[in-house]
Amino acid sequence: MIVEEIQGNIANLSNSEKQKHVEKVYLENSDLVKRIQRVVTDHGTEIGIRLKQPIDLQYGDILYADDHNMIIVDVNSEDLLVIQPRTLQEMGDIAHQLGNRHLPAQFTETEMLVQYDYLVEDLLKSLGIPYVREDRKVNKAFRHIGHSHD
């Protein structure tokens, strides 16, 4: 089976649509940005992914669906630093520091998420910014954004 486009996301399905038999493809965060790859579901089904559009995969993306079955993307958990700034000043300080290091980050209402790095952990300790190291799933890829200093 070759998948060339995403058919939706389980987050947008009704409860009755979610009752289909589900197979999952477990991906590493770094694989979410790959348009072309060969994967195997948790039921042993081999799938080729060759996306026509240059989009990143996300947790819950539907790779295949029929009347009774669907194959969705799941994301393996990974080692993260969950940064919990108490003030806007702390948030600005750590965001500036992480930006200078060109580290990709993700944000929730109250947290900044970065992939574990012992140097960032040392920085957080030295700045006194609260954080926890946690194994957690993220819904989308950590992506570097290229730019120039010219």
Curated annotation (Swiss-Prot):
InterPro entries in alphabetical order: UreE, UreE_C_dom, UreE_N, UreE_N_sf
GO CC annotations, alphabetized: cytoplasm
Keywords recorded for this protein, A-Z: Chaperone, Cytoplasm, Nickel, Nickel insertion
Cited CDD domains: UreE
Tagged with keyword Ribonucleoprotein: no
Pfam families: UreE_C (PF05194), UreE_N (PF02814)
Gene3D superfamilies reported in the protein's UniProt record: Urease metallochaperone UreE, N-terminal domain (2.60.260.20), UreE, C-terminal domain (3.30.70.790)
Biological-process GO terms, alphabetical: protein folding; protein-containing complex assembly; urea metabolic process
GO molecular function: nickel cation binding; unfolded protein binding
Subcellular location: Cytoplasm
HAMAP family: UreE
Summary of the function given for this chain in its UniProt record: Involved in urease metallocenter assembly. Binds nickel. Probably functions as a nickel donor during metallocenter assembly.
Family listed: Belongs to the UreE family.
Name of the protein this chain belongs to: Urease accessory protein UreE
Organism this protein belongs to: Staphylococcus aureus (strain NCTC 8325 / PS 47)
